[in-house]
């Protein structure tokens, strides 16, 4: 081989590695650029997802707040309705109790009115007995009148009617005694001397006050 040919071969060997190094650098640069672009896209997607997630969370929080307000309003309405129902129930209960008391009062008043009228009949029986004491009793009239009066008294007792007949010397009770007159007496001044007509009470209520005479003061 000539000197010129050897020189050309050496030159070719020397230039070949330099060409390979340049190609490698270009490949590495292209790879770095691709990775950077991918990273940017990932970061952009993450940002978009974060924004969307934040919007979803905000919407959910607003919905929760709205539902909480609606629940509070519903609870207030339920409480108000419950209170109104309880008030109505209490009013109805009170009405029933008042109606029951009214019925009882009407019944008692009707019974009292009847008893008061019947007491006049009993007074007549007493008067008949007083008259019979001074007359003959050949026909047994007195006994019949006494039996009638006794039966009458049993009926009154069954209805809860009791007699008001104060004793001499008792104090005057304005609610149960009616003073007919004042007389001279050995009883203490202002006390009862005698009973002119007995009174009656029914279930603790005075149907007719006893008529009495009172010692003068």
From Swiss-Prot:
Subcellular location: Cytoplasm
PROSITE patterns: GRPE
A GO cellular component entry from the record: cytoplasm
Record InterPro entries: GrpE, GrpE_coiled_coil, GrpE_head
Region (Disordered), start-end ranges: 1-39
Example of a GO MF term: protein-folding chaperone binding
Residue stretches in coiled coil: none
Protein task: Participates actively in the response to hyperosmotic and heat shock by preventing the aggregation of stress-denatured proteins, in association with DnaK and GrpE. It is the nucleotide exchange factor for DnaK and may function as a thermosensor. Unfolded proteins bind initially to DnaJ; upon interaction with the DnaJ-bound protein, DnaK hydrolyzes its bound ATP, resulting in the formation of a stable complex. GrpE releases ADP from DnaK; ATP binding to DnaK triggers the release of the substrate protein, thus completing the reaction cycle.
Xref: HAMAP family: GrpE
Subunit structure of this chain's protein: Homodimer.
Protein's UniProt name: Protein GrpE
Lineage: Archaea, Methanobacteriati, Methanobacteriota, Stenosarchaea group, Halobacteria
Gene name as annotated: grpE
């Amino acid at each position: 081989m000539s000197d010129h040919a050897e020189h050309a071969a050496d030159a070719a060997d020397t230039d070949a590695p330099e060409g390979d190094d340049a190609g490698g650098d270009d490949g590495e640069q292209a790879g770095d650029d691709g990775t950077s672009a991918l990273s940017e896209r990932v970061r952009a997607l993450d940002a978009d997802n974060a924004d969307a997630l934040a919007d979803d969370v905000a919407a959910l929080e607003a919905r929760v707040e709205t539902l909480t307000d609606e629940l509070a309003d519903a609870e207030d309405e339920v409480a108000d309705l419950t209170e109104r129902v309880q008030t109505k129930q209490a009013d109805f209960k009170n009405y029933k109790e008042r109606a029951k008391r009214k019925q009882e009062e009407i019944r008692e008043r009707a019974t009292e009115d009847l008893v008061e009228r019947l007491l006049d009949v009993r007074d007549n029986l007493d008067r008949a007995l007083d008259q019979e004491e001074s007359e003959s009793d050949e026909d047994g009239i007195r006994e019949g009148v006494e039996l009638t009066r006794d039966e009458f008294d049993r009926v009154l007792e069954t209805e809860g009617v009791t007699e008001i007949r104060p004793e001499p010397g008792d104090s005057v009770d304005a609610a149960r005694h009616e003073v007919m007159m004042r007389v001279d007496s050995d009883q203490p001044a202002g006390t009862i001397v005698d009973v002119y007509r007995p009174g009656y009470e029914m279930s603790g209520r005075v149907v007719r006050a006893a008529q009495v005479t009172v010692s003068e003061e």
